[in-house]
Design a protein with these regions (language model features):
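Terminal leader/tail segments of proteins
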Residues: 1-124
Length: 124
């Protein structure tokens, strides 16, 4: 599916609420296929991520399997903080740092938790 070009944040926020792919000059949202899910090898698992100024800073992630919004607790810039406020979903189940949220995009929430447990790391 091709991302819808939007020219104002209000349209972007509306599309993000419906988890539609969109592109704005500084914010975009798109579905991603989780590719590192060992525990879900035979199942298609997707997440919807909303980014500010590139894929290095995901603001929010919808995990399709758990049916939850996950948020980025880190701050990046004043403009990105404005984006985080504007695009914030009505309910965020859990907050993660940028690196953790990027890992969740790669393998989904279940894959992320499984990987942490296998490495003997705490799951908070």
């Amino acid at each position: 599916m091709m991302a819808k070009k939007v020219y104002n944040h209000d349209d972007g926020v509306r599309l993000a609420r419906y988890r539609d792919d969109f592109e704005h000059a500084s914010v975009y949202g798109k579905w991603r296929l989780c590719w590192k899910s060992k525990d879900l090898e035979n199942h298609a698992h997707k997440v919807y991520a909303i980014y500010s100024y590139g894929s290095h800073f995901p603001m929010y992630v919808w995990d399709e399997l758990s049916g939850q919004w996950l948020g980025n607790s880190d701050k990046y810039s004043r403009t990105t903080s404005t984006h985080q406020s504007k695009y914030r979903p009505s309910e965020v189940a859990k907050w993660f740092g940028t690196a953790e949220l990027c890992s969740i995009i790669d393998c989904g929430l279940v894959g992320y938790i499984t990987n942490r447990m296998e490495q003997g790391l705490p799951v908070s």
